[in-house]
């Protein structure tokens, strides 16, 4: 009869590369166990790490996400997808309303968001849109919310008193 002992890791090496990046080596492992452990670790991290994201967007003079903005290269849906890529940190508050206001030709960057001591933008050079007309002014109001895991906009619980009127676009976070 064959022995049913599993290989047990003899070496666990953790090397910190930066404040947000580390490399963990565990060896030896049975064939296929590396993928199993990696997937489990990824799922746990995605579901339990706290973070901040934009959950609601209102763009001046826009009623829904399928609109276009005259003088802006991207359509509203593309701008919303870019907003979802913002890397934001709310160190002290749970929610925060912020405004982005840009007029004139050129890229609309994350750094164009109004300065707020309660908000830290980790990717300030990220391009959200491109204005192609001198007379175009882009005004975007956003709500940043602190949370944990991934939350679909449809599954988010809304207070019955909240005004989810025309023009307020909800984002997954």
Predicted segments — roles?
Residues 1-173:
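Protein-protein interaction/assembly regions in multi-subunit complexes
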């Amino acid at each position: 009869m064959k022995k049913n002992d599993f290989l047990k890791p003899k070496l666990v090496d953790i090397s910190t590369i930066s404040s947000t990046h580390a490399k963990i080596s565990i060896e030896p492992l049975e064939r296929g166990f590396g993928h199993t452990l990696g997937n489990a670790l990824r799922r746990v991290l995605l579901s339990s790490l706290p973070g901040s994201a934009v959950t609601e967007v209102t763009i001046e003079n826009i009623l829904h996400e399928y609109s276009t903005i005259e003088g802006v290269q991207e359509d509203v849906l593309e701008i919303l997808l870019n907003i979802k890529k913002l890397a934001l940190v709310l160190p002290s508050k749970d929610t925060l309303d912020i405004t982005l206001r840009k007029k004139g030709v050129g890229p609309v960057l994350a750094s164009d968001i109004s300065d707020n001591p309660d908000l830290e933008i980790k990717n300030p050079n990220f391009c959200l849109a491109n204005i192609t007309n001198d007379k175009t002014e882009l005004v975007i109001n956003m709500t940043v919310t602190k949370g944990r895991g991934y939350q679909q906009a449809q599954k988010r619980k809304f207070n019955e008193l909240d005004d989810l009127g025309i023009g307020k676009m909800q984002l997954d976070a």
